[in-house]
Each structure stands twice: as structure tokens, then as C-alpha cells.
């Protein structure tokens, strides 16, 4: 009490001397006062005072983290001269709430539970220099804290992050690292997606084939993807590791759909009896666990029994999403089940399946979470709904009395683009910038006042179809997870400009901790290939206003010049938060963003100076294109000049047949002319392998994953006919079949708002 009174008196006196400063903490605390004129210094007189047994793991972790970068070995003692006191305060109404007092000669962290104390220590760590996150000792650093009082508690009890090790396997070391970092920002649930069509990653001792067969898949080109799995002992270790950091692991076993890896191992649990193969492509599989086979539910119970022995979490996630029911419609056992249970549709059969699985979980002492499709066939009041197809599932669930967790795909799917798809790595097709995440409100207005407390919180999801490794996973998670952490934790504070300022310091922490976070890329160019006649103005900016450079060229003689004094190339050592450039000769412009000594990926745009718009060819009157097809698997177009074509014919346009099978791959070359109606600059895009116009290869997707029209070209074309060559490669590239996207060429003038697809009337021969 004397210490608290002294603190109050010091703050009152200092208010006359200095304005209170902010703290660069994410998420923003509920309430705090800070003054830097007096400080607590870590030294040999510092120690950790921890008298409650349940806090000992938290204290030991804090001591370990402090030692790595400071070299100080803080003892855990009953008393010392400069104590850091950790204490659980049972009077706090929220178990995750904390109060942090920092004096010149003591620190006190009071939490509603061990998790609350841990969160208080994370705020303390963020008040130290960013170098506190380094793994090696940093000499010459001022390891001190400003005197402060911080009072804080969470808005939502469920603050989740989802990871998917089933499309591309993520090693346990990566998952542990994410537990470390998400907990630093007070996220408290790790949703671990353990099974899917493409891989089974949970060891089930009663069914060893699940991991013997379900962890590898044979690709169309004959290569084998060998993933991995987690042993039960490894996962028990992960659970304990996360518990100390205030994180609960919520495991997910997908059913009745997304189960091809399981059916490949145990085909007797499918409607047809197999044979099945682990799915080699992404997307939705039509085969499901058989709802009419009682042995399936014993299979599920056996798996869930072993799962719950590993994971002590209150909730178990059972999936339930994306279940096309055609296979059930054709299955005699499923139809018999429907008749027996008085069910009229397969959607109701899906509801029966989910409710029966929930009964198994209740017998095991657990509660069920499912994706929002579980609402469609009827769900019990005790089920918790994870709303991913927008807000509607969460609204319906909450208003009918079910608990819900909000994770709408347009705001919470971190596998979506966070910058321009022209230059960012391949991602799912949505666009989710940092500011959109920060601006999200998790409780929709359509939820009635009496049901608003049914929203437990929210969650970020990272599906790994286009996440090849752990490094890229971090690139997609951070810093968007920091924005979400503030949305889910901060009670009544939201200021994006202030968040961006705090983010600068936190990004330095990520750098020190070896986290591969996303830096924004320069934006402004509309294409990777741009034609011009005299000169072209280029304005580059980025979403966080960080410095940018353009490499290798800096004068008009070299092709690119600055439009304002003081903006130059990297060699000149000058950067700008907005670059205004003038391109006067053909040149390859490379530019990037830099922050804290770290550079973003480099974007490249080729500016091609032409004397005049490409002249049109002679008048043509016959529609159509010449097509050649060669059968076989072509990883890229390198060998195309030496191919003997199997088919040569005449077609009206680019041909698309959804029934084409990627299991019998082939490559096609279309040649002819395209007609444009006026002389103009035309923006052209396609997901084809290659596109040539007037003998210039303007788009090259050879050997790349092709979707989302990420390659564009801006050409100057004269009114009339222009030669065209298009290459379409019907193969699977990293799980994505080319024929999931129509072989289209899209075009528009600079003035037009929307692209149009070139069709039969546009092509000539």
C-alpha cells in the first residue's frame, strides 16, 4: 500500500513537469499513466518475487526471456532490493485482467490468473527496448522501464489464430514459435487444423494407417509430397508449452467432409468402399464419411477419445464445412438412415451426423465447435458456431441462442492478398489489407442486445494451399495479427493512425525476434510491362508510408529520372515516402520499401519506349484461331519449340471444357489475330501460360501457379488486327489445376472501368 501511495504522489508531482507519454504497446491497454522522468533499472539487485506455486512457470519463462538479451540472471526469491512481484489477485473479475505497477525500485504485476500475470509481463516487455526480443546478449543497451501504472482487461474471451499443416506441412518448431508470438499480443487460442483431404497429421494409435498413408500424396506429374505428422507426445508437449503462455490449443478433426486422407487409409468408412487416394489438388472433395454406417461413428469416437486424451481444451472443433451430399444421395446406407430417422434431405442428414458426433464429445466431457454449415441441418443449443461465410452464420447462431466465434472470410482469412496481386506472392483471391483488419467490428448490428454476449470473440485463419513453408506463413500472419489482437482485446480504443505509429516499434521487435513479417510493397504501376511513346509518369507509394528506393538507375540518361529534388537511387542513399518518377527511355524499374534496415521484396516493371502504337496488320475477314495440342505433362514451356503436336485444328475462340481431366495433361498453342476497335493503350491480362501480341511476349506465367490474373501488360495498339499467340497448359501446378480457370484473355482501355473477355467475334485468321 505504501508503494502504491508513493507512486500516486510521484505521478501527481510529475504532471506539473512533463506531459504523460504514450507507450508503444499492442494491443492498446484499457487505461495507463506513464512518465519517463523516473525509471526502474534492471540490474544485479533485481529479482522476481513469486510466492504462488501456479505462477512459477510464468516466472521462470520471464527470467529466461530477460536473460537471453540482457545477460541478467534474475533470481526467483522471496524478497530482494528491487523486486518484480508476480501475484494472482482473486478479486479481479476477469481471469485475464492485469494491473502493472512500475516504480523506481519495484515492479508489481497483479493478474486475475496466471494468464493475467503473463499478459501483464508481455506489456512490461513491450515497454522495454525492442532488442529485448533478441536471442543473444545485446551490450550497451539501457534496460529500464518508465514509472507507470497500467490497468487492462480483454473485450473478448476467445482471441484465436488458426493454422493449417495439412496442405503444406508446418513443423512443430514453427507452431511453437507462433504460440510465442501470438501470446505476446494477448491472443489466447490456437486452432490447430489437424486433418483434411490432403493430409492427416494427428497420430491415432488405434488406426496407424491414418499417418502411414494419410501423410503423403502422389502428384499428377508422379512426384510424391511427403508431409509429416505430430505424435501424441509432441502435441502434449505443445499443450503444456502453450499453457504457460496463456494459449489453449483447440484441435480440429474434419468430418464428415474433408476426409479423403482418412478414407484413403480406411476405405470401409466411405460410402463406396473405395479405393480412395489422398487428394492431390485443393478444393472440395465429393467423398464423405458414410452417415449410414454405424461403424463410422465408432471410428470417430475412437479418434476423439485419443484426441481428448492429448488436448484438455474445453472445445473440440469437428469441422462440418463444405460437404456436397451427392454421394449420400446415391448411397443405400445413407438413404436407409434418412428413412429410419425421418429425414427428408441430405442436409438434414448432415445435421444428424453433426449432432451424433456432438453426443460423443459430451460423453467425453467436451463441447463442440463447427463451421457455420452445421447450422444448415439443425444444431443443438450447446453447439458453438464458427462463422466463416460472412457474418450471417454468427448472426443466426447468436440470435437463436448459440455461442459463436466470428471469422468472416473477407476480414479474417489471412491467406488473402495484403497488397497488390500484381506483385505480392500468390494468395487466395480476396484482398485483406492491414487497415481493413483493424477496422473490423466483430459483433454485427443485426445481433439483438440480449444476445450480443453470445459472440465469444474472433479468429484469424491461415489456410496453407498457397503457403509453401513456415517463413511464408509468418509473412501472411504479421502484422495483420497485431491489428486483430487490438480489435479483440481493446475494450473501447480504436485509432488506426496511432496503431501505425506503435506498429513501427513493434515491427522492430519482430525484426529482433526473427519474425518474417510483411513489409508493404511499392504500389502504383498497373502492369508489369508498360509501353509508352514520349515519356511516362510513375508515382510510387506504399500503405504504411515507409521509405522507398528504386535501384540501379537515377538519371534521365539511364532512362529514369526524379520529378522532385532529393529522390534518387539506392546508391545515392536517399529515400522517399512517395516517389514521383519520369521514364523517358526503355528501362527496367526496380523498387522496394525499406524499414529498420530491412527491405521488402522488389517489384519490377519493364517500361518499353516505342516510336508509335503497334501498326495493324492487313484486313482479315475470317473469324477463328489455329489450335495445336500436344499430350503429356509440361512443367513449363521451355521445350515447346521441339514438341510434335498431336492435334491441329481451327476453333472459334479459346476452348474450355470443364470435363477435361488434369490427370491426362496436355498443352495447347493458339495462333491468329485479335481485332481492336480504336487506337489506344490497352491493358491486357490472362492466366494462360504465355501470351504474345505482335510477336512480343507480354505475359509469361511459364512454370508458375496461374490464377487471379496477376500478370498484366499495357500496350499501345493501332485500330485493326494484331497477331496473337496464346499457350494454355492443362496441368496441375502445386495443387491447382489450370482448368479451374477458363482460358480467357481480358482486355480494356485505360479509360474503361472493367475488363471484357475476348470471344469468338474478336479473333481472326
Q: In which residue ranges do the predicted regions lie?
A:
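Acidic, contiguous N-terminal accessory segments
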Residues: 20-157, 367-371, 375, 379, ...
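Feature activates predominantly on carbohydrate-active enzymes
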Residues: 26, 93-315, 331, 356, ...
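Acidic/polar, compositionally biased interaction segments
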Residues: 240-243, 248, 610-765
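Active-site neighborhood of glycoside hydrolase catalytic domains
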Residues: 277-280, 284-381, 388-396
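Flexible, acidic glycine-rich loops studded with aromatic residues
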Residues: 368-373, 378-383, 389-534
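Short, solvent-exposed S/T- and G/P-enriched segments that are highly enriched in secreted/extracellular
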Residues: 535, 552-554, 559-561, 573-587, ...
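Append "Rare intracellular matches occur via the same short Y/T/C beta-strand/loop motifs
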Residues: 550, 581, 587-597, 722-724
Amino acid at each position: 500500500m505504501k508503494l502504491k501511495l508513493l507512486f500516486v504522489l510521484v505521478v501527481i508531482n510529475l504532471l506539473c513537469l512533463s506531459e504523460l507519454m504514450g507507450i508503444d504497446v499492442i494491443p492498446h491497454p484499457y487505461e495507463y499513466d506513464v512518465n519517463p522522468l523516473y525509471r526502474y533499472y534492471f540490474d544485479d539487485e533485481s529479482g522476481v518475487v513469486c510466492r504462488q506455486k501456479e505462477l512459477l512457470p510464468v516466472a521462470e519463462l520471464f527470467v529466461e526471456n530477460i536473460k537471453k538479451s540482457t545477460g541478467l540472471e534474475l533470481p526467483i526469491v522471496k524478497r530482494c532490493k528491487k523486486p518484480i512481484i508476480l501475484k494472482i489477485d482473486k478479486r479481479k473479475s476477469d481471469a485475464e485482467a492485469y494491473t502493472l505497477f512500475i516504480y523506481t525500485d519495484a515492479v508489481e504485476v497483479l493478474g486475475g490468473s496466471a494468464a493475467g500475470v503473463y499478459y501483464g509481463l508481455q506489456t512490461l516487455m513491450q515497454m522495454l527496448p525492442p532488442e529485448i526480443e533478441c536471442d543473444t546478449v545485446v551490450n550497451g543497451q539501457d534496460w529500464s522501464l518508465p514509472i507507470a501504472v497500467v490497468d487492462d482487461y480483454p473485450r473478448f474471451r476467445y482471441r484465436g489464430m488458426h493454422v493449417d499443416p495439412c496442405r503444406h506441412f508446418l513443423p512443430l518448431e514453427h507452431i511453437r514459435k507462433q504460440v510465442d508470438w501470438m501470446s505476446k499480443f494477448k491472443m489466447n487460442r490456437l486452432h490447430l487444423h489437424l486433418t483434411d483431404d490432403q493430409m492427416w497429421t494427428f497420430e491415432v494409435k488405434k488406426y496407424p494407417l491414418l499417418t502411414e498413408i494419410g501423410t503423403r500424396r502422389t502428384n499428377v506429374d508422379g512426384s510424391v509430397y511427403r508431409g509429416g505428422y505430430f505424435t501424441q507426445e509432441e502435441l502434449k508437449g505443445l499443450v503444456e508449452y502453450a499453457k504457460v503462455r496463456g494459449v489453449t490449443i483447440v484441435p480440429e478433426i474434419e468430418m464428415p467432409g474433408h476426409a479423403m486422407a482418412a478414407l484413403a487409409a480406411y476405405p470401409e468408412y466411405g460410402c463406396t468402399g473405395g479405393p480412395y487416394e489422398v487428394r492431390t489438388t485443393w478444393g472440395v472433395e465429393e467423398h464423405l464419411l458414410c452417415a449410414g454406417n454405424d461403424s463410422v461413428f465408432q471410428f470417430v469416437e475412437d479418434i476423439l477419445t485419443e484426441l481428448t486424451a492429448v488436448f484438455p481444451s474445453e472445445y473440440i472443433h469437428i469441422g462440418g464445412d463444405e460437404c456436397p451430399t451427392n454421394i449420400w444421395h446415391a448411397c443405400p446406407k445413407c438413404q436407409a438412415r434418412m428413412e429410419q430417422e425421418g429425414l427428408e434431405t441430405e442436409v438434414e442428414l448432415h445435421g444428424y451426423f453433426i449432432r451424433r458426433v456432438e453426443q460423443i464429445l459430451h460423453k467425453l466431457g467436451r463441447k463442440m465447435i463447427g463451421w457455420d454449415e452445421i447450422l444448415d441441418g439443425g444444431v443443438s443449443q450447446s453447439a458453438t458456431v464458427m462463422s466463416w461465410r460472412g457474418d450471417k452464420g454468427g448472426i443466426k447462431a447468436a440470435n437463436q441462442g448459440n455461442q459463436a466465434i466470428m471469422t468472416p472470410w473477407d476480414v479474417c482469412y489471412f491467406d488473402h492478398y495484403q497488397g497488390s496481386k500484381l506483385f505480392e506472392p500468390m494468395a487466395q483471391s480476396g484482398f485483406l489489407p492491414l487497415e481493413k483488419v483493424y477496422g473490423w467490428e466483430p459483433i454485427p448490428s443485426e445481433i439483438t442486445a440480449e444476445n450480443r454476449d453470445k459472440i465469444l470473440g474472433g479468429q484469424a485463419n491461415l489456410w496453407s494451399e498457397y503457403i509453401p513453408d513456415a517463413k511464408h506463413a509468418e509473412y501472411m500472419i504479421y502484422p495483420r495479427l497485431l491489428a486483430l489482437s487490438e480489435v479483440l482485446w481493446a475494450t473501447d480504443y480504436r485509432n488506426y493512425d496511432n496503431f501505425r505509429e506503435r506498429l513501427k516499434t513493434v515491427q522492430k521487435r519482430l525484426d529482433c525476434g526473427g519474425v518474417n513479417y510483411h513489409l508493404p510493397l511499392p504500389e502504383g504501376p498497373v502492369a508489369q510491362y508498360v509501353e509508352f511513346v514520349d515519356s511516362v509518369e510513375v508515382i510510387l507509394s506504399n500503405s504504411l508510408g515507409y521509405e522507398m528506393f528504386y535501384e540501379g538507375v537515377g538519371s534521365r540518361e539511364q532512362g529514369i529520372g526524379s520529378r522532385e529534388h532529393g529522390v534518387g537511387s539506392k546508391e545515392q542513399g536517399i529515400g522517399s515516402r512517395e516517389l514521383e518518377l519520369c521514364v523517358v527511355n526503355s528501362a527496367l524499374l526496380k523498387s522496394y520499401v525499406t524499414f529498420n534496415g530491412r527491405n521488402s521484396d522488389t517489384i519490377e516493371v519493364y517500361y518499353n519506349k516505342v516510336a508509335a502504337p503497334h501498326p495493324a496488320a492487313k484486313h482479315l475477314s475470317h473469324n477463328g484461331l489455329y489450335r495445336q495440342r500436344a499430350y503429356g505433362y509440361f512443367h513449363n514451356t521451355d521445350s515447346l519449340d521441339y514438341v510434335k503436336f498431336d492435334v491441329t485444328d481451327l476453333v472459334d475462340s479459346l476452348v474450355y471444357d470443364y470435363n477435361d481431366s488434369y490427370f491426362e495433361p496436355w498443352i495447347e498453342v493458339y495462333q491468329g489475330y485479335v481485332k481492336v476497335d480504336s487506337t489506344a493503350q490497352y491493358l491486357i491480362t490472362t492466366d494462360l501460360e504465355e501470351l504474345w501480341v505482335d510477336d512480343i511476349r507480354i505475359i509469361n506465367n511459364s512454370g508458375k501457379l496461374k490464377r487471379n490474373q496477376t500478370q498484366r501488360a499495357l500496350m499501345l495498339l493501332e485500330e485493326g488486327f494484331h497477331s496473337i499467340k496464346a499457350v494454355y497448359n492443362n496441368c496441375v501446378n502445386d495443387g491447382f489445376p489450370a482448368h479451374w480457370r477458363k482460358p480467357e484473355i481480358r482486355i480494356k482501355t485505360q479509360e474503361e472501368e472493367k475488363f471484357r473477355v475476348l470471344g469468338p467475334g474478336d479473333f481472326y485468321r
